[in-house]
Amino acid sequence: REFNCTGAAATINNYLIKSPFAVLDFNAAAKEEVDFIKSSDSVYNANLALMKSANLPANFTKKEQQRLLFKSYAMFPMYMSYHPYLKKMDSYTPTALYTNKLKEVAIIDGNCLEYAEYGDFIMNAVFCQAFQGGDRSKELMAFMDANIKDAKVKSYITNAYAYDVVSSSGLDGKDELIAYFHKNVSDPKLVDKFDKVCKQWEGLKAGCISPSFTATDINGKQVSLSSLKGKYVYIDVWATWCGPCRGELPYMTKLEEQYAGKDIHFVGLSCDSNKSAWEKRIQKGDMKGIQLHLGTKSDFMQKYLINGIPRFILLDCEGKIIKADAPRPSEPNITKLFDELLKK
């Protein structure tokens, strides 16, 4: 239904709500640098023309022009990862043509954080330049210390990254990142929120007793975690609808075959809300290990702070946590970890 805003800011609001802003398509990253830059510039110029045609107040257009810069070039930083992906390249190093343009548009100015578009844009710009295939936290901290002098921008990126990493994967190996957070983030609300999630993960450190579960196998039998003591337990929290979960299944099968007869229980814990979907998948007969249905409303998932799947958990023979966020079956270091444990 067509509608119009009224009142003192009607012109601005109608412009923001109704304007068909230009955006750059993901596939544009397949273009070579010179053409990608031209396409990005064209999007920005089209949005500027749209703004100028709207007869907006002068005090608004100055800010809007800056907002449109970040909105129009939103995909520009991701070119470094999207381009080699779309072109199926083993490696890609951007030329000075691209990097100079990135420096031109990626303004480091904390005052720009008033625009939602800037926060996402500058974070992606920093991530794409910082991450080089090693330890991401170390790479990011080193890059920001060398290149980001604006305290507001540094705090914004540090908070967003550190909170996401700790809330999703815990405290293991995060001491340096946590210290970096407290050095660069001073907003009491952000610090309190971060400290709370750190405290939640304290109970999931290595050596802590694992939260328990009782789940149902395909025959309706109840199986508890305590019944699995005596062997290491490698748990896969998954669901039939989860693409990344399904992607790990072939690797899990290989692991189970490689360590058959060893002191490791391989446990699949389904969090499917639709139990029949899980039953149909298990009845295919190609999934090994101990397959159980846990469901969505589980204390186990809440206590392990699981907010995304798949999630892998590794426990020792006494039911104590080794890793609350263990490597996936597809990661090479999982076999090294198993081998080290089995030598003990």
Question: Residues of each region from the PLM?
Answer:
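Active-site acidic short loop of glycosyltransferases
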Residues: 229-231, 261, 287, 306
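Oxidative protein folding and maturation machinery
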Residues: 1-219, 223
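Extracytoplasmic/secreted envelope proteins and their assembly/folding machinery
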Residues: 65, 275, 279, 331, ...
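Structural microenvironment flanking redox-active thiols in thiol-disulfide oxidoreductases
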Residues: 247-285, 296-302
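Thiol/disulfide oxidoreductase modules built on the thioredoxin-like
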Residues: 285-287, 294-340
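Conserved redox-active cysteine motifs that mediate thiol-disulfide chemistry
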Residues: 229-230, 236-254
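Alpha/beta-hydrolase fold active-site loops
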Residues: 232-233, 310
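Conserved hydrophobic packing residues within short motifs/helices of P-loop NTPase cores
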Residues: 235, 267-269, 313
